[in-house]
Curated annotation (Swiss-Prot):
Belongs to the PsbJ family. The chain crosses the membrane at residues 12-32. PSII is composed of 1 copy each of membrane proteins PsbA, PsbB, PsbC, PsbD, PsbE, PsbF, PsbH, PsbI, PsbJ, PsbK, PsbL, PsbM, PsbT, PsbY, PsbZ, Psb30/Ycf12, at least 3 peripheral proteins of the oxygen-evolving complex and a large number of cofactors. It forms dimeric complexes. This is Photosystem II reaction center protein J. It comes from Bigelowiella natans (Pedinomonas minutissima). It is a single-pass membrane protein. The gene is psbJ.
Length: 44
């Protein structure tokens, strides 16, 4: 199963890595901004 995800470079495609990292970063920022806006993270 794992071999099917390995390409010619032996690494995960860069666009997949960028998409995952970007999604996690935006999600984390969204949670932080939402928390600070609603007052849940205002104590931080």
């Amino acid at each position: 199963m794992k071999n099917s995800f390995i390409g010619t470079t032996g690494r995960i495609p860069l666009w997949i890595v960028g998409f995952v990292v970007g999604s996690l970063a935006l999600g984390l920022l969204g949670i932080l901004f939402y928390g600070s806006y609603t007052g849940l993270g205002s104590s931080l």
